[in-house]
């Protein structure tokens, strides 16, 4: 059985992944799967820079607006749903194209990534929920140093899950993680977009300004009024920074500057992650040859035996 070819476009936020994916889909008869952990949520449009129907240009997209913010969409769920979408697109005789910046989610599709599908212990989880995030992370560091290096202490939900898996199975959560072996089902080409740091940061700042012009405050206020401030979906950059403003604990300008700052830091982490974790063919973004270079690489990849 021949492997399914998949084009994967990755890179930091605001680098130009979306426009490139549309161009390649049009030229290569492809359909697009969003590889963004936030764009799966309905109602989170402006803050996630979600592609609009007009921007889609008639290209079918998958894993956009598939669940409500109150319902968590995990990496394991993304893995299974993306694999289904790849099969659907391939069976239709089209090219699957994944585009996004959530490295863990994308990596899980192509590598033998085991998420530790242990059952839940609600009582144990409830006990952990009462603890401070710093204490939880210290517990994880003592019990599973490798997982502690991979999971930020602010990611309380994932820290708790790691502790819960160890509690249920007696096995460190890190032992369930990625094995650096490609899944035999797929033949992926990883294309990464890179941009000069100053230009990228300028783009990020401009994007945040545009989000405010498009109505980010209204979008975030709706989530705030629905009491969704603590769900994983709205912990993403662009929403949580505005909640103190709604509570009159910060100014609007402070909130905007914090979103820009957090977005820049996030872009830096994305680049570091992709460079250290995946075998990527990098392309310079923001130049006249970006699209043609990506198309040439994709065409060569698809025609190679």
From Swiss-Prot:
- Protein's UniProt keywords contain Magnesium: yes
The protein's UniProt keywords, in alphabetical order, are: ATP-binding, Magnesium, Nucleotide-binding, Transferase, tRNA processing
Residues the entry annotates as binding ATP: 11-18
Its Enzyme Commission number(s) read 2.5.1.75
Which parts of the sequence are marked as the site Interaction with substrate tRNA? Answer: 102
Asked if the keyword Nucleotide-binding belongs to this entry, the reply reads: yes
Q: Which InterPro entries does the protein's record reference?
A: Dimethylallyltransferase, IPT, P-loop_NTPase
| A GO molecular-function annotation | tRNA dimethylallyltransferase activity
* First-tier enzyme category under EC: transferase
Q: Which residues bind substrate?
A: 13-18
What are the required cofactors? Mg(2+)
Give the residues annotated as coiled coil.
none
Provide the residue span(s) of the region labelled Interaction with substrate tRNA. 36-39
Q: Which Pfam families match?
A: IPPT
Family label: Belongs to the IPP transferase family.
Q: What's this protein's function?
A: Catalyzes the transfer of a dimethylallyl group onto the adenine at position 37 in tRNAs that read codons beginning with uridine, leading to the formation of N6-(dimethylallyl)adenosine (i(6)A).
Q: Which HAMAP family match?
A: IPP_trans
Q: How does it assemble?
A: Monomer.
Protein name stated in the entry: tRNA dimethylallyltransferase
Species of origin reads Listeria monocytogenes serotype 4a (strain HCC23)
For this protein's source organism, the top of the classification is: Bacteria, Bacillati, Bacillota, Bacilli, Bacillales
């Amino acid at each position: 059985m021949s492997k399914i070819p998949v084009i994967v476009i990755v890179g930091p936020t605001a680098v130009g992944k979306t426009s490139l994916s549309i161009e390649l889909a049009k030229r290569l008869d492809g359909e697009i799967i969003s590889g963004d952990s936030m764009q799966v949520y309905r109602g989170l449009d402006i803050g996630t820079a979600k592609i609009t129907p007009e921007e889609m240009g008639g290209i079918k997209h998958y894993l956009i607006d598939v669940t409500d913010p109150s319902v968590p969409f995990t990496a394991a769920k993304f893995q299974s749903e993306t694999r289904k979408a790849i099969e659907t697109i391939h069976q239709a005789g089209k090219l699957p194209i994944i585009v996004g910046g959530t490295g863990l989610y994308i990596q899980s599709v192509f590598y033998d990534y085991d998420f530790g599908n242990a059952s839940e212990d609600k009582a144990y989880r409830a006990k952990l929920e009462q603890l401070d995030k710093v204490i939880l992370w210290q517990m994880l560091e003592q019990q599973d140093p490798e997982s502690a290096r991979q999971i930020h202490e602010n990611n309380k939900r994932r820290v708790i899950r790691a502790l819960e898996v160890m509690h249920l199975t007696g096995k460190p959560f890190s032992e369930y993680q990625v094995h650096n072996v490609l899944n035999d089902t797929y033949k992926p080409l990883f294309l990464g977009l890179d941009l000069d740091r100053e230009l990228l940061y300028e783009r990020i700042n401009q994007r945040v300004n545009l989000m405010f012009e498009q109505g980010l405050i209204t979008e975030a206020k709706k989530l705030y009024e629905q009491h969704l401030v603590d769900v994983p979906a709205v912990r993403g950059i662009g929403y949580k920074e505005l909640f103190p403003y709604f509570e009159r604990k910060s100014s609007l300008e402070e909130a905007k500057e914090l979103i820009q700052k957090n977005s820049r830091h996030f872009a830096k982490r994305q680049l570091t992650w992709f460079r250290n974790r995946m075998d990527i063919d990098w392309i310079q973004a923001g130049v006249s040859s970006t699209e043609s270079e990506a198309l040439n690489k994709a065409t060569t990849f698809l025609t190679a035996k």
